[in-house]
Structure formats: structure tokens, C-alpha cells
Amino acid sequence: MTLVHLRAMNSENQKPLAFRLRMVHENGTQACPLGRQINFQVIRTSGVGGQTLINGKVYHWIDGSCEIPLEPGRYHLELEAGIRFVPIRRTIEVKPGQAALRFNLEPCNFRWKDWIQADARCHSMSPAAALLEGSAGGLNIVHLLAREFHADVNQTADISGLLE
């Protein structure tokens, strides 16, 4: 298994883009970026950090690039950066010893490109997770609703540095 650096960029300006990622090996094993999980809680009021479950499939929110351990072989790749960019859904080949994967996302040319996109009601996530998911989903605004309750912190996307 090789640790591969994966990056997605805007094809117009070559700047990194936050994105949603799903990679499944031809043997059915899902690839998981470092710092993310394949199995996580999906119950109401439980923040899930840098991953999400959509129609029974696990996706990972990535801030522009990630390190991902990959076996050589063919993978089905799904890479999306909101509705302003054409998603990439295709089969790719990872060769033995390959160190990097780079993807350019093409901007969509559609009538709503100058509109503001927002999620007006987000619960049970930290500001860092809301920023990551909103950016990867192509949102301009995320309205994070705060409330007070006591719960265990399990947000792997929020950990930066050493815990003391």
C-alpha cells in the first residue's frame, strides 16, 4: 500500500478546491483518507466530522488535498465540488509506487453562476466542520444554529495539533 497525495484544483486558475470524495477499489474496498473514517455514527445530533453518508454511500469532505493509502489497481472515483463545477465520476488506475493524483475540475457554465448558495439551517456540527462541508459543497454561506447540550466530542475534522 502506498500513501498517495490527492489534490483537486479549479481548472481556470489552478487554485485548490475543497471537495467531496469517494474512491472504491475494484475489489469493493473503500479507500479512506488519513484522518477520516469509514464507519461512523449517523444519528440525530451527532456530528460526523469530515465524512458523510449519502444514499448509503460514505463520502469524505476534503479541504483541497489529502493523503490516502491506496493499493495498486483500478478505482471508481467520485469527486465533486458543489454545483459550480462539473463532477468527476470515472474509473482510474493507480500504479505501484504512484505518489500523486491530480484532478482539475471544470467550472459549469450555467445561468445561476452568480447566485449566492447557502444552507440556512445546520445543526450539530462545529464551525470548522461547517466551513469544510460548506466549502466542499460549493456554498457561500452556512448558517450554523447553535444550541446547548452535552455530548461527547468525536469530530476528527476539528483536531489540529496535540491534545493536552
Where are these regions (language model features)?
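Extracellular Ig-like/FN3 beta-sandwich strand-entry sites
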Residues: M1, P72-R74, Q98
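A short, solvent-exposed beta-strand micro-motif common in secreted/extracellular proteins
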Residues: G50-V58, P72-G82
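Short acidic/polar inter-strand loop motif in beta-rich domains
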Residues: G82-I88
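Short, surface-exposed beta-strand/beta-hairpin micro-motifs centered on an aromatic residue
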Residues: V58, D63-L70
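Extracellular beta-sheet/turn segments enriched in Thr/Pro/Gly and aliphatic residues
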Residues: I92-F110
